[in-house]
Structure formats: structure tokens, C-alpha cells
UniProtKB/Swiss-Prot annotation:
Organism: Homo sapiens (Human)
Lineage per the UniProt record: Eukaryota, Metazoa, Chordata, Craniata, Vertebrata
UniProt crosslink position (Glycyl lysine isopeptide (Lys-Gly) (interchain with G-Cter in SUMO1)): K8, K524
The protein, known as: Ran GTPase-activating protein 1
Result, substituting S356A: No effect on phosphorylation
Chain positions found as N6-acetyllysine: K524
N-acetylalanine sites (modified residues): A2
Amino acid sequence: MASEDIAKLAETLAKTQVAGGQLSFKGKSLKLNTAEDAKDVIKEIEDFDSLEALRLEGNTVGVEAARVIAKALEKKSELKRCHWSDMFTGRLRTEIPPALISLGEGLITAGAQLVELDLSDNAFGPDGVQGFEALLKSSACFTLQELKLNNCGMGIGGGKILAAALTECHRKSSAQGKPLALKVFVAGRNRLENDGATALAEAFRVIGTLEEVHMPQNGINHPGITALAQAFAVNPLLRVINLNDNTFTEKGAVAMAETLKTLRQVEVINFGDCLVRSKGAVAIADAIRGGLPKLKELNLSFCEIKRDAALAVAEAMADKAELEKLDLNGNTLGEEGCEQLQEVLEGFNMAKVLASLSDDEDEEEEEEGEEEEEEAEEEEEEDEEEEEEEEEEEEEEPQQRGQGEKSATPSRKILDPNTGEPAPVLSSPPPADVSTFLAFPSPEKLLRLGPKSSVLIAQQTDTSDPEKVVSAFLKVSSVFKDEATVRMAVQDAVDALMQKAFNSSSFNSNTFLTRLLVHMGLLKSEDKVKAIANLYGPLMALNHMVQQDYFPKALAPLLLAFVTKPNSALESCSFARHSLLQTLYKV
């Protein structure tokens, strides 16, 4: 490190915050690669008496630097809180596990008794969980109360490793007469899916002391939701349940409602964008009506809830004296339904708790496709049953053919809206309209476009116009989820759209990328374009796109330059950003 760099580092460290047993290097943007780089940080740690909290967020720590920092921590037995989120920016994923192992060993050697461990926004993936697995199983974590692992990309494998480590920690600590009493668990945006969530649910059942669980955006469907619900039932101290942007459907919502009936301490419920639908909302309303006396906030926004179900939810709030917010935005109440909802709450003197209904869909518009929606709901509920019976059907089919019968597409009956008579239809719901999807994109609508969705979207888009291609790309990528079926549908649509565009001689690739950066808020523009709010989907779609043969490699340096620049919107999607950066470095 050059002498001027050392002087700059020393100046930065001089501004280090020290308060109440806490040593903070938060947001200093320190690049600690070698032992020499970390020399002054180590001195600060060594000279700090009674160190209880160490903040390393917003810096980047390499393997060698982590090793010497860990050595300094070996003498800090009073350390209780490790705020170590976002401290591996720009590191290869292979660097992170050994760095975490070293830091963990330092804490174990010190005999620390941790209360809080925050490793959020470190894109370490499943392998990274192995980096702190030994720490979680050690006596240093027998006293752990808060574990925060938001946006780490753990995946199913990482979720299982984490669950096993927590279970082992509880077993070992119980043997010493002081069972692990974890209170706060945060693991949003980790691609846990059903298997990862189910494994963690088993650990939660063993622990039984949880007060807050935050697991939004994990691609969890009703089997995983049901497992979590059963685990929550044996955690009677739960106050906050945040499962935003997973997929409950009616089955998951009903299971969760049964658990809510048994809990008395719940204050905050966030099931927004969870597709609980009307029947699920009614079940939750019934659970709330009979309990949850301390409820302060309920979020059921964007859940495809209709008017009557929404009114049932509102009516369940009658005796909730502590209620501060009820969010039913983005459902299908219609103008009249919104007015009725407000009237119900006004009758309870609770009008002020109702969140905005600005994104509500008109009920009349919804009724036009009501039969199609109901059919889709029935189909989704039958999916699991069909999967379970698939093997039996495959065994029966050869026998039927042997009897001279032709294989046919399974059909079922629904009522004809005009005659009221049963009308045979294919078991799959009618495909959604491409223009409807592009106007109001959602994962469900994309899947309902069917196997030709990618071709249809590409055909619908004028690929000679970069602005229109940007618009289509952002709408498709906005519905990206880590759930396998949605992820593949998004990637296929992106491939069809962008291959058609980039292969066109009239398409201006540079203009496309420039306009894309503008719409993502990464490049300023004179036309004052409103940047999209969430970059996770577009970043994940870009990560896929830049690896394809059709992508002009000459665009990679420009994209890399803008994704590398500091940006608050990018920082909130650190896993997706880190993954894209790793890919771009290889292009």
C-alpha cells in the first residue's frame, strides 16, 4: 500500500466512531486485503477496552486481513455484537468462507458470548454458510438472541446447513443447562424455497423462543409455508411475522390462520404479495377476530383479495385497540368496495389506520376474467394432487392404450357462464393475453402465457425501437423470482426478446444499454425518467443475458462501470449486484 494510501486510511480511522462499548468502522469503504492494510484497524481493536460491539459494515475484508483481525479478536471476550453486514464487496465467493472461518475461530478462542450476529448483504451463497457453521455450533453462540442473514443467497443447501447448525447449537447449549434462546431471525431474499424453509421450520420448532421472523422473498410455496406455520405455533412469544412476497395460496393461508389462532403476542403480520386470495384472507380474518389482541399492523396487499373477503378482514379489526396500519392495497375491491371498506373502519373509529388503496384494481374489470381466474385457482390447487397421482396415471395409461383407447388430454367441467350448464374444458387454464401481461406484469400471468410465452412476447415487441425493447425487458424481468418455474420463464422470455433485438441490423445496442441504465436509475437523463423501484429482477435477468452468445461483449465494460458505481438502489440488491459483477469480470 502506497504511503499516501496509508495516510488516507489513518485519516479515516481517526474518524472512527467509539461509543458505549462499540467500535465502528461502518461505511468507511476500507479495502482491507493484506495484514498491512488492516494494521491500523487491528490497533484500534487491540486498544479498545471492554469491546462489546464491532461494526465492519460497508468495508471489504479479504482472507489475509480477516485472519489478522481474528487474531486481534481472540483477546476480546466481552464482544457481544458483530455487525458484519456488507463487508465482502467485490470479493470472489471463494474468498468469503475462509475469511468467515478465521473470524469465527477468533470469537471462539476469545470465549465470546454473542448476543447478535449480522452477516446480511454478503453474497456468500451456500458455501458461505459453511464459513460460519462452526461458529454457530460453538459456545460463542449459545447466548445468541439475534441472527440476521438477509440477502445472502444461501439457497436451499445453505438453508439446510443453517438449520442443522442452529439445531446442534440448541442441543449443545441445552446440555449445559442454558438452551439457545434465539429471539430474532432474519433471512429475506435467500432463495430458500420449500426445502430450505422446511428445514429451518424444524429448527424453529426445537428452539421455541422466537419473537421475530423475517423471511420475505424466498420463493416459498404452500408446503414450506405450512411447515413454518406449524413451527410458529410452538413459538408463543412471536411478535413479528414477515413472509412478504412468498406464495401462500389458500392452503398456506389456511394453515397460517390456524397458527394465528393460537398466538397471543403477535403485533405485526406482513403477508403482502403472498397470493393468499379471498378464501385465505377470510381464514386469516377469522383467526384475527378471535384473537391477536396486540395486533398493530396487518399487510395483505397485492394478494388477489376480492371485496367481500377484504370487508371480512376489516370487520375483524373491530376490537383491535392497538391497530396502527391495515394495508389492503393492490387487491380487487373496486371503487364501491373501497368505499365500503373505509365505511367499516370509520364505524370503528379506525379510518386513519387504512393504507392507500391507490393500486386497487376495478372489480368490474376483474369480473370480466372471473371465470378464467377461478379456473386458474382450481388448477393451482390441483397441481400438487396431480403431481402425487402422476405415477399412478402413467401406470394406468399403457393399460388403457392396450385396450384400444387413445391417450387424451385430461379434462374437467366448469359451469358455462351463459347457460349455467357444465362445460368441458382443458385442465390447463386459458392462456393469458400478452398485452395484458405487459400492461400489468405478474409471475402468474407470465406462466399462464404457456410454453410459447417467450416467442409471443418477442413477437409483440417492436425490436427496432430500443426504448420499446427496454420497456419489455424491464416488465419481463420485474416478475423474476427464484422459484424455478418463474426463473426459467423469465430467462426464456429475455433470451427470445434480446436475441431478436441484438440480431437485428437496425437495432442500436448502445442506445438500448444507455436507456436501460437510465430506467434503472444508474444514469441520469434530461428527460427525467422515473427509475424503477426494485432492481433485483433486472439485475438477475442481466446476469443471465450477458452470459449468452447473442449478447454483444463490447457492451460489458460499460455495464460493468455503472454497476460498480455506488448507488443506494444497487446496495439494496447486493446479492444480485455481486452475482452480476462476478459474471461481468469473466466476460
